[in-house]
Amino acid sequence: ANWRRAGYFDKARLALIRGHVTDSRAKGNIIAYDATRDWLMLSSYHLTDERIPEYLKALENFQPDFLNIYPSSALQLAEYLQRHDQRWRTPLQGVLCGSEQLTLSQKRLLEGVFQCRVLRWYGHAERVVLAAEGTYSELFYFWPHYGFVEFGEPDADGLQEVIGTTFHNMAMPLVRYQTGDFVRLAKP
């Protein structure tokens, strides 16, 4: 449901550049393909200036509808293209960025390079709470069906810690889990 805000649809061709280990060797294979979902998985660990042309060729050959990518990897690709006076040649319907911080100015840069909407979301491996930008807003909204979210007391800068209770792990639930992540609450 989160990705649908960026136009994601069932059977969309998805390319991922995230923490997928495709090969443990530095010069190893960067690509894995999941035929059951029609997903092209590329290793974020091998993403270097020397190997970016391989990534670009693989993406152009695959022609994904969406790119699910760490913000740092997306910025690395965008900055490479700018430095080498190249354009992004694979039409995308959206770029899905999560698991790392992406500022609004960085988001604007990515939207300029990829020529599509970039959707940011917040979550973590513990799967306690999830938040994403709104359909028509760049404010983040927590998903109430994913986990129960609370906020700690504001610090001197007005930041509050995200505290959550998961709805996903009933065998060993995390209750009032202090994430160590801080947010500034806004009035939508």
Language model segments and positions:
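Active-site glycine/GP-rich loop and adjacent strand/helix microenvironment
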Residues: 34-188
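Conserved ATP-dependent adenylate/AMP-binding module captured primarily in the ANL superfamily
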Residues: 1-12, 52-62
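Conserved AMP-binding loop of ANL adenylate-forming enzymes
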Residues: 4-34, 42-45, 99
